[in-house]
Amino acid sequence: MLGKHSKIFFGVSLIFLVIAIVLASWGFQKIVNKQIQKNVQLANDSKMFERWVKLPMPLDFKVYVFNVTNVEEVNQGGKPILQEIGPYVYKQYREKTILGYGDNDTIKYMLKKHFEFDPEASGSLTEDDELTVVHFSYLAALLTVHDMMPSLVTVVNKALEQLFPSLEDAFLRVKVRDLFFDGIYLSCDGDNSALGLVCGKIRAEMPPTMRKAEGSNGFYFSMFSHMNRSESGPYEMIRGRDNVYELGNIVSYKGQENMPMWGDKYCGQINGSDSSIFPPIKEDDVPKKIYTFEPDICRSVYADLVDKRELFNISTYYYEISETAFAAKSANPNNRCFCKKNWSANHDGCLLMGLLNLTPCQGAPAIASLPHFYLGSEELLDYFQSGVQPDKEKHNTYVYIDPVTGVVLSGVKRLQFNIEMRQINNIPQLKSVPTGLFPMLWLEEGATIPESIQQELRDSHKLLGYVEVAKWFLLTIAIISVIASAVAVARANALLSWPRNSNSVSFILGPSVTQVNKGN
């Protein structure tokens, strides 16, 4: 009977061990991951969906302006001296309007942004500060004409002198609020035929930085008013219900799967997320690059994996922008399709390291870079006497991603807007200025998740830790049970095969007594 029970115990222990191995190697992890992934996919009843539709916290939108302190010297050919003023901090609120759902696990939406000035975070800076900056809109108009029809540049400049009030040189004295959102008034009143053509061109193309002035024959120029309280899109994005590892990928923008202005499928590809949501990361297949689609520059940008880092006591993957993202075609031949002739009359259109031509995207000869030309060509710095100093800590773009949920714990995007200052002999405002790339301002857009969400993530990671402990505990118990049952079976078999005779030792009664005949 003892042997039979031991064998049953051994069999049950083996089954228990097999179950423990299956659960430990596959089952527990899959059950927990499935529950976590159910919460991160964009299903209407998931936590992530609610937070994705309306961000639970505002983003920090910071603007740093390059104030020109030696205008007269620059007008005479001297190197610019710049003074960085900022940050002017705004709270950026984001909300999405759902338009519908696609057949391929996609969701269509419009994105609305709203900006509010944050005086506390801005410190002593106010929107009434008056600064001197490069005259972006004037130079954009003049350079466009100079590149396309140089013979008309003097005629158009006369019209621009009427369009822009108090146009003395290539610099603008302006209040911060007017430069950013309220707008600088451009008057189309006048009898100059060239002015009529210029205003007609603006009216027909209406660049993002221009808007029609209500009740008058003119326009307002501002850098960001087109972003405020207006919707962009529609975007079409994968929800991650069918495959959570595709969550957040943008598949189309404004109904297009490729940005046509670059004339090339590689440069025009729309891939990656909108930077607000990423898919979970497989620990055995960590992506070397992550992509985000940036409609403001009409392209996708990638960041490279650096390493694994801890943030807020949470293990994350840290990515930062690669120097090849804005590399010259000599360093990254794939970027050759971003080359467009506009930078100067005898330039092939392929810009220096660290620059991106925005003319095809914005309709104006703007050039993007990282702040202070970080990761750009050293040649760009030679143009300035002082005030431009790239610094990785201040000017890098990066993101920390939780691999379990894909949630961004902290991230910052930074971008600088520049325009060419070009010497044109027959234009009074430009006849003596040094030719070079002139920065106007740079932006920092980022956020760090609040403590409440940090705690949720820590709890998720703790749960995985508990599962790991439970896995090994279950395996240990199963192995001990198998060993114990195996020993019991072995001992039972030994008992059954033990020799039974008169000289044997009884484990119950003790040794038998043998009678000895001593004789007479």
From Swiss-Prot:
Bilayer topology reads: Multi-pass membrane protein
GO CC entries? cytoplasm; plasma membrane
Q: Which keywords fit this entry according to its UniProt record? A: Cell membrane, Disulfide bond, Glycoprotein, Membrane, Olfaction, Receptor, Sensory transduction, Transmembrane, Transmembrane helix
SS bond partners = 267-337, 298-361, 339-350
Q: Which residues lie toward the Extracellular compartment?
A: 29-468
Q: Which InterPro entries match?
A: CD36_fam
Q: Where in the cell is it found?
A: Cell membrane
Which residues are sugar-modified? 44, 67, 104, 228, 271, 313, 342
Tell me, what is an example of a GO biological process annotation in this record?
A: sensory perception of smell
Tissue specificity statement from the Swiss-Prot or TrEMBL entry = Localizes to cells surrounding the sensory neurons in the antenna. Associate in a ratio of 2:1 with the neurons expressing the other subtype SNMP1.
UniProt entry tagged with the keyword Ribosomal protein: no
- Topological region Cytoplasmic: 1-7, 490-520
Q: Which residues cross the membrane?
A: 8-28, 469-489
Question: A single GO molecular function, which one?
Answer: scavenger receptor activity
User: Has UniProt tagged this entry with the keyword Protein transport?
Assistant: no
Q: What does this protein do?
A: Plays an olfactory role that is not restricted to pheromone sensitivity. May play a role in the elimination of lipophilic components from the sensillum lymph.
The record's family statement is:
Belongs to the CD36 family.
The protein's matches in PANTHER family, at most eight in alphabetical order, are given as: SCAVENGER RECEPTOR CLASS B TYPE-1 SR-B1 (PTHR11923), SENSORY NEURON MEMBRANE PROTEIN 2 (PTHR11923:SF109)
**Name listed for the protein in its UniProt record:** Sensory neuron membrane protein 2
To which species is this protein native?
A: Heliothis virescens (Tobacco budworm moth)
Task: Supply the source organism's classification.
Answer: Eukaryota, Metazoa, Ecdysozoa, Arthropoda, Hexapoda
